[in-house]
Amino acid sequence: MQLSSLTAVSPVDGRYAGKTSSLRPIFSEYGLIRFRVMVEVRWLQRLAAHAGIPEVAPFSAEANALLDSLASDFQLEHAERIKEIERTTNHDVKAVEYLLKEQAAKLPELAAVSEFIHFACTSEDINNLSHALMLREGRDSVLLPLMRQIAEAIRELAVKLADVPMLSRTHGQPASPTTLGKELANVVYRLERQIKQVAGIELLGKINGAVGNYNAHLSAYPEVDWEANARQFIEGDLGLTFNPYTTQIEPHDYIAELFDAIARFNTILIDFDRDVWGYISLGYFKQKTVAGEIGSSTMPHKVNPIDFENSEGNLGIANALFQHLASKLPISRWQRDLTDSTVLRNLGVGIAHSIIAYEASLKGIGKLELNAQRIAEDLDACWEVLAEPVQTVMRRYGVENPYEKLKELTRGKGISAEALQTFIEELAIPAEAKVELKKLTPAGYVGNAAAQAKRI
């Protein structure tokens, strides 16, 4: 059976293939091979640029052009050739080396130094840098733009609905009023904190040999400052952060940090998805219908909040994967074991489920329509929420047991506007204070919620 969106085992490459296509050049097998080739090529160029390695003279413009084309314009046919070589070698990184030697043979200048391809490297030197480059491209070109798009979409909604008063609910019960925009602004602030942390995670790399001590490097060129050269390569050539202390593997702590930060963003988005789902259920939001869509196979009237439900489900899967990778990858027996290898092949899966979720949330946000009448009805039915300001003013003027008196009047039961007005009139407080309290309505008792929403 041929692989297609219908036959793929994972919905990431099946049902949701169209939503995850931007990740294929980055996190696929092709993507990993592409980055391995880039690292190998740049390492060879780094050796040629080093005055302490005379056996690899500085490359000509022609040689650098050939190498640059391999690194920056890597073709699918090259990856297919590497997989063909791997069927013989049964070693994926060695197959990359052999492909590069084949390409180097096209130019005598490069053919003469082909044994310096993969010089002094262990496979993990190439792999760890490739993984860091994959994560950087996936984060910067796909993940962060979508994260920012979500925060901006919610921000626009928050500002638009800044002045819409709404009944709060704590423990599911009526509480002091807020505005719908302010509750959305809370989400924006939380999301943007995590976006900043995701963007700020340093992506680490190493190229220090089989156990992290430059053993092979120093045996061949003891006079070269290999640590300085490695730092220049990783930070100057690749734009990553140099990790000076490793075993055979870069310990992956930064991957745990990155995935934990993405998972926190996802957790906040789950909270948002559930809250909006609840507001739709209460009737505070209506959803724009799409011609031809069906909400239920048996109930024709249904317009379900499926986008927020899809988002919540995919975010849960993503976070489960991130949690496993973040807890497993920093652990490796002694100088290394191979348990990280198969796990690292799943770097893009949690990110894929995340972007599926982000697209679903954005689609859901785009369908939302305010039902102002329904929100106002709920608020006007809960005059008991004004017990808080009344008892607070009573405290100011020294009325005994203000909390207890309001508790007796309101706890567990609704009260009318008239009943509250009568209670206020009988209070032993200044007349002007009574006037101000009588002006209060649930819709007007929102503090500075609107101002907070507008400045987000």
Curated annotation (Swiss-Prot):
GO terms for molecular function: (S)-2-(5-amino-1-(5-phospho-D-ribosyl)imidazole-4-carboxamido) succinate lyase (fumarate-forming) activity; N6-(1,2-dicarboxyethyl)AMP AMP-lyase (fumarate-forming) activity. Its EC number is 4.3.2.2. The keyword Heme does not apply. Pfam families: ASL_C, Lyase_1. N(6)-(1,2-dicarboxyethyl)-AMP binds at residues 15-16, 90-92, 122-123, 248, 297, 302-304, 310, 336, 341-345. It catalyses: N(6)-(1,2-dicarboxyethyl)-AMP = fumarate + AMP; (2S)-2-[5-amino-1-(5-phospho-beta-D-ribosyl)imidazole-4-carboxamido]succinate = 5-amino-1-(5-phospho-beta-D-ribosyl)imidazole-4-carboxamide + fumarate. GO terms for biological process: 'de novo' AMP biosynthetic process; 'de novo' IMP biosynthetic process. The keyword Aminoacyl-tRNA synthetase does not apply. The active site is at residues 171, 296. Catalyzes two reactions in de novo purine nucleotide biosynthesis. Catalyzes the breakdown of 5-aminoimidazole- (N-succinylocarboxamide) ribotide (SAICAR or 2-[5-amino-1-(5-phospho-beta-D-ribosyl)imidazole-4-carboxamido]succinate) to 5-aminoimidazole-4-carboxamide ribotide (AICAR or 5-amino-1-(5-phospho-beta-D-ribosyl)imidazole-4-carboxamide) and fumarate, and of adenylosuccinate (ADS or N(6)-(1,2-dicarboxyethyl)-AMP) to adenosine monophosphate (AMP) and fumarate. Homotetramer. Residues from neighboring subunits contribute catalytic and substrate-binding residues to each active site. This is Adenylosuccinate lyase. It comes from Pseudomonas aeruginosa (strain ATCC 15692 / DSM 22644 / CIP 104116 / JCM 14847 / LMG 12228 / 1C / PRS 101 / PAO1).
